[in-house]
Amino acid sequence: MLTPMVAGGVVFPGLFLLSKNTLQRLPQLRWEEADAVIVSARLVSSVQAIMASTAGYIVSTSCKHIIDDQHWLSSAYTQFAVPYFIYDIYAMFLCHWHKHQVKGHGGEDGTPRALGSTWAVVRGYLHKEFLMVLHHAAMVLVCFPLSVVWRQGKGDFFLGCMLMAEVSTPFVCLGKILIQYKQQHTLLHKVNGALMLLSFLCCRVLLFPYLYWAYGRHAGLPLLSVPMAIPAHVNLGAALLLAPQLYWFFLICRGACRLFRPRGSPPPSPCQTQD
């Protein structure tokens, strides 16, 4: 178990540092630290999402029996991804920190003027990103132990499908980068927003009805009978996982309405609702 976790603990922070240093030091680029940090964090999130989605696709398509079939990649990638969620909490804080400095709240050397200011940044970060931080903490403290211990090797198909929920993440990250560089008016931003909306709907919202339908087909039950046929704690867990997805999807839809509504000036992006 430790080998994949150690690998994840090296890969994700290492990729972040490599990207940040490259963007800052290449003579052709010479980016400011704030820009390099924010873009590097988005890059690492996109890479993790692609890896998770690929692993999920391999696992879910390899498991013909949705309960008993196993695939080594399901447990290996779950362990590998745990350090990512810990790293990403810190990476999101760094992004928030640098945005705070850009707004003029830092000292001349780019650091907060006082300890009180530092705590103000921390409080602002936790207030703005509370749901995401809670989500990441739950992944590490709840979902990981459950997937390793409670499942007892069963249900790899469902875990693979859950990993494929990350399909929408690269579109979210690209949208935030485009916003960072004031490209909300471009065709790329609109196409990316539409793809983000579609991928989020299919891979994060409709994922849960699909999993219920898949179990119902396996057990010979109609879809509406599945919730009554499975343990209550499974329904509770699914509801807790679905709730933030519905909230984020609502924000994306609200932003998409503003994006595609004709206006005199460039409108906000659907990604801006999650930034």
Swiss-Prot record:
One Pfam family this chain carries? Answer: TRAM_LAG1_CLN8
- Name all TLC domain ranges: 34-261
Superkingdom of origin organism: Eukaryota
Disruption-associated phenotype: Knockout mice exhibit a significant reduction of the cone photoreceptor light responses, thinning of the outer nuclear layer, and loss of cone photoreceptors across the retina compared with wild-type animals. Knockout male mice are fertile.
List residues traversing the bilayer. Answer: 130-150, 159-179, 194-214, 232-252
State the tissue distribution.
Each isoform has a distinct expression pattern. Isoform 1 is highly expressed in brain. Isoform 2 is expressed at low levels, if any, in all analyzed tissues, with slightly higher levels in testis. Isoform 3 is expressed at very high levels in testis and, at lower levels, in white adipose tissue. In epididymal fat, isoform 3 is expressed at higher levels in obese mice compared with lean mice. By contrast, isoform 1 and 2 levels are significantly lower in obese mice compared with lean mice.
Keywords (alphabetical) are: Endoplasmic reticulum, Golgi apparatus, Lipid biosynthesis, Lipid metabolism, Membrane, Transferase, Transmembrane, Transmembrane helix
DNA-binding recorded as keyword: no
Q: Which reaction does it catalyse?
A: sphing-4-enine + octadecanoyl-CoA = N-octadecanoylsphing-4-enine + CoA + H(+); eicosanoyl-CoA + sphing-4-enine = N-eicosanoyl-sphing-4-enine + CoA + H(+); sphing-4-enine + hexadecanoyl-CoA = N-hexadecanoylsphing-4-enine + CoA + H(+)
Lipid metabolism among the record's keywords?
yes
**Gene Ontology BP terms:** ceramide biosynthetic process; negative regulation of fat cell differentiation
* One annotated Gene Ontology cellular component of this protein: endoplasmic reticulum
What GO annotations for molecular function exist for this entry? sphingosine N-acyltransferase activity
Enzyme Commission code(s) on record? 2.3.1.-
The record's function comment reads: Involved in ceramide synthesis. In vitro, isoform 3 stimulates the production of C16-, C18- and C20-ceramides, isoform 1 slightly increases the levels of C18- and C20-ceramides, while isoform 2 exhibits only minimal activity. May interfere with adipogenesis by stimulating ceramide synthesis.
Name of this protein? Ceramide synthase
Name the source organism: Mus musculus (Mouse)
